[in-house]
Amino acid sequence: MMLKSKADYKRKSEGTESITFRIGKSILDELRQDADHKLKSVNTLVNQIIKSYITWHKPARKAGFGYFDNVLVSYIINILSDEQIIQVAEQYCKQRLKDISFMLYSENTFLSFMGGILCWIETSGFSYKYNNVDDAHTLIIKFDMGRNWSLYFKTYMQLVLEYYKIKDALCEMTDNAVIIKIKSQYI
C-alpha cells in the first residue's frame, strides 16, 4: 500500500503474538488450497484475512458500506447522464465524506482517506498500479466498469482533493480506469 496512516505505523511496531484456535477441516483445506495457489503460507494468508477484517470489513460495515455486484452497479450508473453522475458524486461527497473518514479510521485526514481507498480497492479486487516518480505519486485504478463509473469515481476523487485542499493534483479517466496524480508534498 502506498500511503500509511499513523495508526498503520503504530500497529506495525506493536509486534506479534501467537494464538491457537480450531478451524473446521473443510475450511482449513480451502485455506491451504488458496495459500498454495497464492504461493503463501497458511499463516500469512490467515494474517491477511484477519487484517482485512480489522482494517476494512468491520469498520466498513459500521460506516454503512455493503457488497454489491459490479455488473449491477454498472447497469444502474449507465442509465444516468453525465450531469446526473456528477450530481450524485457531489451529493455523496457533501453528505458522506467526513462521516466515512471518521467511521473507517477515527480521523479525517487525506492520508487516512487514501489508506481507506486503497484498502477498498484491494478488498474489492480491482487492479491498480502505484508509481512514485519525480516527486509525484500516481495511482491508476482499473475498474472495468465502463465510462460512467470512471466519470463518477474521477469526479468523486476531484471533490476529495478539493475537500482536503490538495493542490497540484490531477484526475484523469479512460472508459475503464481512473488515474490520480498527486505531488509528493501532500503525501
Labelled PLM ranges:
Residues 172-187:
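C-terminal edge-of-domain segments
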Residues 123-174:
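Short, hydrophobic/π-rich interface segment
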Residues 47, 114-118, 154-158, 162:
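Generic solvent-exposed, charged/amphipathic alpha-helical segments
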Residues 70-139:
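An N-terminal amphipathic alpha-helical segment
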Residues 30, 40-63:
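Short, basic amphipathic alpha-helical segments that act as recognition/interaction helices
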Residues 1-24, 35:
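Short Lys/Arg-rich basic patches
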